[in-house]
């Protein structure tokens, strides 16, 4: 029987068990047991990782362990016991560890979840459509479609700002760039944004002081907000600040935190008044789960059941 779970601290209010069990409630494991998901809470990363090694087939990883988990798999890879390929190698943080025949593999479904959520914002219904048409290859096809459609939606390269450069922010930065957006990085310490830009010169990231946040929002097409707390400027925004630029598409605002959103009801009302699109943190959670659970189980999750679980 495979065992699955989540490490991080604090995680007691996580919705991940709800989503995982909804994703596979109509399916059984090879031994006939149901798919279950545990919260492996604790502030000690090494203890949590050891528990994974001893007892679990695959785990999700959340704050504050994403970069520590990546570093651990890097160490294992040097010994021939770890696997790092694809976007996670550029991001330098992982939210998903899976035991394989080649060792522990690190993945990043924050990256895939962001791409899926943004594509869904611009093309409502596309995720379900592509799952139906392409099954386990839906994400690759979705990403390809979005890149091909970009020039039809924007008359010049669209611009994104990533606010926060932790593990989720790094994934957001790579996702935005891989989707064709020129990408600005903002962090409370500019040096961290600069370090990420220097580490990934192929993306031509532009580090910008966080004091420029308000002006940058006016000028960009996509905002991905990953800080755990709200910047004071959010209260100061008017609806006009969220208005689209000229003939471009509506401005899209996405945030990571679903427990305590930084864009409160008032801010979201201003976004709506400007005909902008707000993607709440639970949609990010949904799509990172949708794209990540396949790595954990080898099975396609039930998207409709997951959506119903979130709404319930």
Set out the residue ranges of the language-model regions:
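Short, conserved loop/helix-junction motifs that constitute active-site signature segments
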Residues: 155, 177, 216, 237-250, ...
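Rossmann-fold NAD(P)-binding glycine/threonine-rich loop
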Residues: 251-303, 307-309
């Amino acid at each position: 029987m495979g065992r699955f779970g989540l490490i991080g601290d604090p995680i007691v209010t996580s919705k991940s068990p709800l989503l995982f069990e909804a994703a596979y409630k109509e399916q059984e494991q090879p031994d006939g047991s149901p798919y279950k998901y545990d919260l492996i809470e604790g502030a000690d990363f090494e203890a949590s990782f050891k528990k994974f090694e001893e007892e679990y087939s695959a785990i999700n990883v959340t704050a504050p362990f994403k970069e520590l988990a990546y570093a651990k798999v890097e160490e294992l890879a040097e010994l021939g016991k770890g696997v790092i390929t694809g976007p996670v190698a550029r991001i330098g943080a992982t939210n998903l560890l899976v035991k394989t025949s080649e060792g522990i593999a690190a993945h990043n479904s924050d990256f895939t979840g962001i791409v899926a959520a943004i594509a869904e914002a611009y093309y409502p219904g596309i995720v379900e459509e592509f799952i139906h048409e392409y099954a386990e290859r839906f994400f690759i096809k979705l990403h390809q479609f979005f890149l091909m459609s970009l020039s039809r939606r924007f008359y010049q390269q669209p611009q994104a700002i990533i606010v926060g450069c932790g593990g989720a922010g790094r994934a957001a930065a790579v996702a935005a760039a891989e989707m064709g957006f020129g990408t600005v990085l903002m962090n409370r310490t500019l040096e961290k944004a600069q370090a990420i830009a220097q580490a990934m010169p192929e993306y031509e990231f532009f580090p910008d002081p966080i004091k420029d946040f308000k002006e940058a929002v006016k000028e960009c097409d996509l905002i991905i907000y990953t800080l755990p707390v709200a910047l004071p400027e959010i209260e100061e925004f008017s609806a006009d600040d969220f208005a689209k630029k000229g003939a471009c598409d509506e401005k899209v605002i996405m945030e990571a935190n679903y427990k305590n959103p930084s864009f409160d009801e008032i801010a979201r009302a201003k976004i709506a008044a400007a005909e902008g699109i707000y993607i709440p943190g639970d949609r990010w959670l949904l799509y990172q789960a949708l794209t990540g659970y396949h790595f954990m189980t080898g099975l396609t999750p039930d998207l409709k059941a997951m959506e119903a679980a979130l709404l319930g």
